[in-house]
């Protein structure tokens, strides 16, 4: 069971968003998560990272698992009094200055931009920095929750190309259909508290979602009649 645990002593119940989830990630899998808003896609991602405690069951990581995780809320954890250069340097104190500067240049922080205060950055610049910190750690499993929000067109295309050439495992939540088409080769559908393989493409999912919404409207009208 995946969801949010009620607080002890306040009488609140566990909020179960996903139930009886049984998934296996194989090396090289490239999976896009599809599902209505609020169905539990982000909950699944957080549970796989270990950020969200399982309500029931267990998570069994591989021996050499190295997770790279990006979600919009991580922008808030950036040290706004620091710089992109220092953020990377903290991760790898022995890395050379030139190595760090070359790496950051690939994410748009060229020259003096690598030494600008994060507090002065736009949402897009902060998103680029957060993605750079994920990439620097060389993960073999990428868990990405709406990574293109705030990114301009150039950086979206750069991210798409980087993910397409990434040799590890990818699980991606995104409304960017171009990104999904270019970087994943299978889909899981998250709906009705379940996570299941979706045998179809994005057009098939659009048809499924439209039919679901129409059925929901009919049910709603029936209740009001």
Predicted regions and their residues:
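ABC ATP-binding cassette signature C-motif
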Residues: 1-225
């Amino acid at each position: 069971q995946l969801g949010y645990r009620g607080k002890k002593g306040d009488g609140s119940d566990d909020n179960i968003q996903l139930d009886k989830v049984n998934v296996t990630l194989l090396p090289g899998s490239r999976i896009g998560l599809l599902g209505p808003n609020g169905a539990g896609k982000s909950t699944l991602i957080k549970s796989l990272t270990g950020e969200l405690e399982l309500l029931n069951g267990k998570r069994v990581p591989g021996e050499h698992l190295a997770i790279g995780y990006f979600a919009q809320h991580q922008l808030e954890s950036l040290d706004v009094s620091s710089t992109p250069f220092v953020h990377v340097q903290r991760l790898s104190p022995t890395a050379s200055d030139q190595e760090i500067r070359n790496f950051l240049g690939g994410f748009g922080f060229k020259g003096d931009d690598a030494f600008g205060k994060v507090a002065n950055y736009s949402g897009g610049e902060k998103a680029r920095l957060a993605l750079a910190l994920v990439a620097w750690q060389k993960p073999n499993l990428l868990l990405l929750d709406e990574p293109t929000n705030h990114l301009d067109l150039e950086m979206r295309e750069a991210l798409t190309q980087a993910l397409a050439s990434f040799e590890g495992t990818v699980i991606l939540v995104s409304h960017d259909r171009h990104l999904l088409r270019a970087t994943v080769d299978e889909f899981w559908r998250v709906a009705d508290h379940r996570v299941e393989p979706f045998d179809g493409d994005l057009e098939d999912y659009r048809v499924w979602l439209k039919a679901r919404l129409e059925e929901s409207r009919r049910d709603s009208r029936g209740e009001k009649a």
